[in-house]
C-alpha cells in the first residue's frame, strides 16, 4: 500500500498500491524499466520500501527477510533463470520443500527415524511438483542439461514444491516458443485452480490475458 522505492534520486516505484484478491491471476504489465521486477523484490524482501507498507494475511512483512517471507507462503520465479545448475531437477525442488520441515541439524547429522521419514516426504512432495509441471521425466537430470523451456517449468515446479499461498512469476514465458507459451498458460490456469494466488509479470500479452 502506497509503496515508494527510491535509489538516491531515482524513484523505481512511486506510491504504488494494489491488492491480490484470493483465487485470481493478476497481471502486472509495463515497459522495460517500469519497475515490475522491483515490485517482486519488495514483495519478497529483497528490497525495502522507502515508504509505504506490504501486508500479507493482515500483517506487515516489510521488515521480514526473504527466507521468512518464503516460509510464510510467498514464492517466486525469476526473469533470468536461477536454478541450482549442478543439482538434479528433483534436488532443486527438494531444496524449496525444506522450508516446510521440522527436523533440525542434529536429526540430519544422525539420520534419525523422524528425519528419514521427513526426507522421504520431502522427496515425494518435490516429485509431485515436477509431475504437475510435466518435468518429472527429468527428475534425475542435472538442471543445466534440461532444455530451456523445461528449465523454465522446473523453476515454477521448485516454487510450487514450497506449497506457496502466493506465486510471483517474473516473465515465465520469456524465451519460449509459441507452443511452449500456450502450454504454460494452461499450467498457470491449473495453478490458480489449486487455490494459489498468482501475480504475473509478462511482456507476452497472450500469456497475461
Indicate residue ranges for each PLM-predicted region.
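Glycine-rich phosphate-binding loops of nucleotide-dependent enzymes
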Residues: 1-209
Amino acid at each position: 500500500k502506497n509503496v515508494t522505492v527510491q535509489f538516491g534520486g531515482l524513484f523505481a516505484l512511486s506510491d504504488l498500491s494494489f491488492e491480490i484478491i484470493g483465487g485470481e491471476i493478476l497481471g502486472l504489465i509495463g515497459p522495460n524499466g517500469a519497475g515490475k521486477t522491483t515490485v517482486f523484490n519488495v514483495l519478497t524482501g529483497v528490497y525495502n520500501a522507502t515508504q509505504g507498507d506490504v501486508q500479507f494475511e493482515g500483517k506487515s512483512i516489510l521488515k521480514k527477510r526473504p527466507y521468512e517471507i518464503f516460509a510464510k507462503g510467498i514464492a517466486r520465479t525469476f526473469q533470468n533463470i536461477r536454478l541450482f545448475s549442478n543439482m538434479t531437477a528433483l534436488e532443486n525442488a527438494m531444496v524449496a520443500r525444506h522450508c516446510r520441515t521440522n527436523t533440525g541439524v542434529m536429526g540430519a547429522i544422525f539420520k534419525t527415524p523422524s528425519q528419514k521419514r521427513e526426507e522421504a516426504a520431502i522427496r515425494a512432495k518435490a516429485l509431485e511438483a515436477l509431475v504437475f509441471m510435466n518435468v518429472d521425466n527429468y527428475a534425475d537430470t542435472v538442471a543445466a542439461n534440461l532444455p530451456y523451456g523445461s528449465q523454465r517449468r522446473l523453476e515454477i515446479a521448485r516454487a510450487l514444491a514450497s506449497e506457496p499461498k502466493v506465486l510471483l512469476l517474473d516473465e515465465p514465458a520469456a524465451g519460449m516458443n509459441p507452443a511452449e507459451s500456450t502450454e504454460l498458460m494452461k499450467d498457470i490456469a491449473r495453478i490458480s485452480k489449486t487455490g494459489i494466488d498468482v501475480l504475473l509479470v509478462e511482456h507476452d500479452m497472450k500469456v497475461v490475458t
